[in-house]
A protein has these predicted regions:
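A short, basic/flexible loop-to-alpha-helix module at the beginning of a structural domain
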Residues: 1-11, 113-114
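ADP-ribose/adenylate-binding Rossmann-like module
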Residues: 75-79, 86-112
């Protein structure tokens, strides 16, 4: 039996806080900015790739986490290599009713970040519930290839 139910929710205009400034934070950020959400990203060291992202819905703070950053946040994404920080911040967030995604600990997740396939009017997500990221990405790539092939064939009819 599963603990997590796969459903789509309206996140329009919601606020996400990403704690972390590296590769995983960058991937999460790029995914989120495909949707109509606001993102605050905070980290003492933000990667050059993230700094290059220009978006009016993004606020970057190159500093250590402070509890005040949880104000008005709906969802928290923890993407650092500091497990103690993740534990402390997730506890603060949950006390405020904020859902948590911890990129380094699936047991500390209230929601998962799936691989997303979007093509025309299709939006498909694939997840292994944090168990096998490589398999998830492989399956998502197979689906992408199939959808590209299928939509090309359908248009030629």
């Amino acid at each position: 039996m599963y603990d997590f139910f796969p459903f789509y929710i309206n996140i329009q205009k919601k606020y996400f806080l990403i704690v972390g400034g590296g590769k995983i934070a960058c991937r999460r950020l790029k995914t989120l900015l495909k949707f109509d959400v606001n993102v605050v990203l905070i980290a003492p060291d933000i990667s050059p790739e993230i700094k290059l992202i220009q978006n009016e819905r993004l606020r970057l703070y190159e500093q250590a986490f402070e509890e005040k950053f949880l104000d008005k946040i709906n969802y928290l994404i923890l993407a650092t290599d500091d497990k103690d920080l993740h534990k402390a911040v997730s506890e603060l967030a949950r006390k405020k009713g904020i859902s948590v995604n911890d990129a380094s600990c699936k047991e500390n997740c209230d929601f998962y970040f799936p691989s997303i396939i979007d093509k025309d009017e299709l939006l498909i997500s694939v997840t292994s519930l944090g168990n096998n990221h490589k398999l998830t990405h492989r399956i998502a790539n197979i689906i992408r290839k199939y959808i590209n092939k299928f939509t090309t064939q359908t248009r030629s009819l």
